[in-house]
Amino acid sequence: MVELELSDGLAVVTIDRPQARNAIAPETMDQLEKALDAAEGARALVIRGAGDKAFVSGGDLKQLSAIRTLEAAEAMAWRMRGICDRLADFPAPVIAAMNGHAFGGGAEVAVAADIRVAADDIKIAFNQVALAIMPAWGGAERLGALVGRSRALLLAGSGTVLDAAEAERVGLVDRVLPRASFEEGWLALARSLANAPAGEIKRVLSGVAPAEAVNAFARLWVSDEHWAAADNVLSRPR
């Protein structure tokens, strides 16, 4: 249901429920938590859905239909909010590889990532209003940070469906790739981030004291990786 692949510092988490359009069920939450535990220490993480129809289609209504009390609804929302927070706070860069549509809660999972890469034929919508509910997994706040408060209210309040190009234009998606080269594209990006000090850059961008940023730079400066790269540059003919 949730698969984790670890290779050369890259963790790829795949929600593998294509028959349910990769919807989030209680067992999916269990396995996502375990996958994130196991991915600790990765230098980059990708979250994606199986197949090419859906990234994540939101909560699995069939399996969540038993939730009928206020307490149970709050518990479910807090749990998924916690999972999305773990994605957002992961110490290395997180990429949402949007291989298919992302609706409702799926859009919330996408905006929990640092970078969203989308196939050119996908659609994304914060369309919880169609079910007379609202984003509750932290997606409303993250949407506002990405596109601005007014546009976030417009998108989530109306449930507007955006295609990949529109999503990129408003800042909701960072890179759009042709469907034919999508898999190779997100994998190349993820590997480049895993092989760079992107985790330190993410930490500085998250807001640290100047002394911490300088210390992070200095640690990289004295690393073997830096001097191997520097020696390679210095040895080139001029």
Language model feature labels by segment:
Residues 1-48, 85:
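Conserved CoA-thioester-binding segment of acyl-CoA-metabolizing enzymes
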Residues 40-43, 91, 114:
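Residue-level detector of structured alpha->beta connecting loops
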Residues 83, 87-89, 97, 103-156, ...:
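CoA-thioester-processing core
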Residues 115, 154, 158-160, 166, ...:
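Well-ordered beta-strand positions
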Residues 230-238:
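Terminal low-complexity tails and localization/encapsulation signals of metabolic enzymes
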